[in-house]
Amino acid sequence: MSIENSKEAALTAELSLAGAFFYTPECPDIEHLRSLSVANRWLDTDLPISDDLKDVAKLTPAEREFYRFLFAFLSAADDLVNLNLGDLSALFTQKDILHYYIEQESIEVTHSRVYSAIQLMLFGNDAAARARYVASIIGDAAIGRKVAWLQAKVRECGSVAEKYILMILIEGLFFASSFASIAYLRTHNLFVVTCQSNDLISRDEAIHTRASCCIYNNYLGGFEKPEPKRIYELFSEAVNIECEFLLSHAPQYSHLLDIGAIISYVRYSADRLLGEIGLSPLFNAPKPSPSFPLAFMTVEKHTNFFERRSTAYSGTLINDL
């Protein structure tokens, strides 16, 4: 190596080392999503969940059991996602990605607190009754199947890229039927504040899903990506698990829900996610009708949902759930 080349290599190494101690823009797409998430910050204290207590009595016993089940799962699911985030963020040196994950973990804490408050409200603020229910439902087969499937697939992961496919499935599919089921309450003017929180959380998860897709597409160059056959296999299994999860506790006779429409939405969501990572659709599910509560969910500006506090939401990100 010539003296000139040696000096250039030394300078490059020096600059690289120095770059570890200050922020340099490297990932414009991820930085955009981080900035969007910051602009959309909200707090669990923004939402007076107790205002919805009056609507609990308006549910049938089967409907009440169904929503208690959903929120028991959702309360636990955010902890599962946070555990995975801590593992994934250590893979990157780009500060844009590290900063994004810090922001995501922060909002997941808000989600967890809101879910806990809604869950307690569904038990008439009886903490002991809630605790007994959670202790009995935590071993439910439908929840257990989701967790067992995810744990098994993490153990089987042949690459970091495949783990990102799992993150896309967690964030984009494993909440889809729950979000849709909660959104149906809005169509009957029930649980207004709970539906408000569902709007905000589902939009946050849209950002998280988009970020996972961006990282998978653009920042895993050093990792071998799974074959399309493997990705389709994972998507197919995840959709089946999500649909069975819904059917396992959905009330058989309820005017609140359209179970068929929710299942179609889950499949449509899977096809959209496949498109985000450059693959053809698997289910060819139709786009939800305009009457579907989540059909036009976007991360766009909405102010004063119920005239208590401005909860303006910025951006134009399409929901990838």
From Swiss-Prot:
Please tell me where Fe cation 1 binds in this chain.
Answer: D78, E108, H111
Which cofactor(s) are needed, names only? Fe cation
Q: Please give, as recorded in its UniProt entry, the membrane topology of this protein.
A: Single-pass membrane protein
- InterPro entries in the cross-refs: Ferritin-like_SF, HSV_RIR2, RNR-like, RNR_small, RNR_small_AS, RNR_small_fam
- Under which EC number(s) is this enzyme classified? 1.17.4.1
Q: Does the keyword Electron transport apply?
A: no
Residues in coiled coil:
none
Q: Where is the signal peptide?
A: none
Going by the record, the broad EC class of this enzyme is oxidoreductase
Question: What UniProt keywords apply to this chain's record, in alphabetical order?
Answer: DNA replication, Host membrane, Iron, Membrane, Metal-binding, Oxidoreductase, Transmembrane, Transmembrane helix, Viral latency, Viral reactivation from latency
The residues responsible for catalysis, as annotated, are Y115
Compartment(s): Host membrane
Extract one GO BP annotation from the record. DNA replication
An example Gene Ontology CC term for this record: membrane
Q: Which Pfam families match?
A: Ribonuc_red_sm
Please give the subunit comment from the record.
Heterotetramer composed of a homodimer of the large subunit (R1) and a homodimer of the small subunit (R2). Larger multisubunit protein complex are also active, composed of (R1)n(R2)n.
What's this chain's function? Ribonucleoside-diphosphate reductase holoenzyme provides the precursors necessary for viral DNA synthesis. Allows virus growth in non-dividing cells, as well as reactivation from latency in infected hosts. Catalyzes the biosynthesis of deoxyribonucleotides from the corresponding ribonucleotides.
Protein name stated in the entry:
Ribonucleoside-diphosphate reductase small subunit
Which organism encodes this protein?
Equine herpesvirus 1 (strain Ab4p) (EHV-1)
Which gene codes for it? RIR2
